[in-house]
Amino acid sequence: MALVIGLTGGIASGKTTVANLFKQQFKIDIVDADIVAREVVEPGTPGLNAIIQHFGQDITHDDNTLDRAKLREKIFSNPEEKAWLNALLHPIIREKMIEDLQQVTSDYALLVVPLLVENNLDSLCDRVLVVDVEPETQISRTVKRDNVSEEQAHAILASQASRQQRLDIADDVVKNNPNDPDLLLQITDLHEKYLAMCKKNLRK
């Protein structure tokens, strides 16, 4: 399997921007945990079938797709239901991510996982790349992008791993504050580093 670089960062840190630069500039294959999480609950999948069996058919729309708003309501204030859902989906998502990583054809792969730290998924990665920004930058970007209040943005931030927790597991860091060095320059340096590691078959 290709060298796997786990890409993570807090909300509004710029993970998607960084991943897209790797893909567009250097043709690096990407496995995105958010996309995988949607795929494993598409109509007809064992994941969605189990959710329907547990919560009832009205957890889906008329076209048999998952009604995410309803599911959020069911688990929002019910820790037991949330735990049940996580116990169902986390192993399926993990298995699908491994499958997708095995299909990679580029020299190395980016595994984009917003909650890499929280869900202990760094075990799937050879290296961890953290997109790091100041909390104030995250707050202002979240308010602007997601049309939420500052209070809501702070609450989202508080629910995620701390900046320090992410940096503690980082092998590499991309700085993405407004005054930091050019993003593409940082990514080009990392790309060259990862290619050199692939050639030497180094994992750490």
Swiss-Prot record:
UniProt-listed InterPro entries: Depp_CoAkinase, P-loop_NTPase
Pfam families named in the record: CoaE
Gene3D superfamilies assigned: P-loop containing nucleotide triphosphate hydrolases
Family stated for the protein in its record: Belongs to the CoaE family.
One of the record's GO cellular component terms: cytoplasm
Protein name: Dephospho-CoA kinase
Physiological role: Catalyzes the phosphorylation of the 3'-hydroxyl group of dephosphocoenzyme A to form coenzyme A.
Catalytic activity: 3'-dephospho-CoA + ATP = ADP + CoA + H(+)
Residues in DPCK domain copies: 4-201
Keywords, in A-Z order: ATP-binding, Coenzyme A biosynthesis, Cytoplasm, Kinase, Nucleotide-binding, Transferase
Pathway(s) this gene product operates in, as recorded in its UniProt entry: Cofactor biosynthesis; coenzyme A biosynthesis; CoA from (R)-pantothenate: step 5/5
Residues annotated for ATP binding in this entry: A12, S13, G14, K15, T16, T17
GO biological processes: coenzyme A biosynthetic process
Subcellular locations according to the entry: Cytoplasm
EC numbers: 2.7.1.24
SUPFAM superfamilies with a match to the protein in the record: P-loop containing nucleoside triphosphate hydrolases
GO molecular function, one term: ATP binding
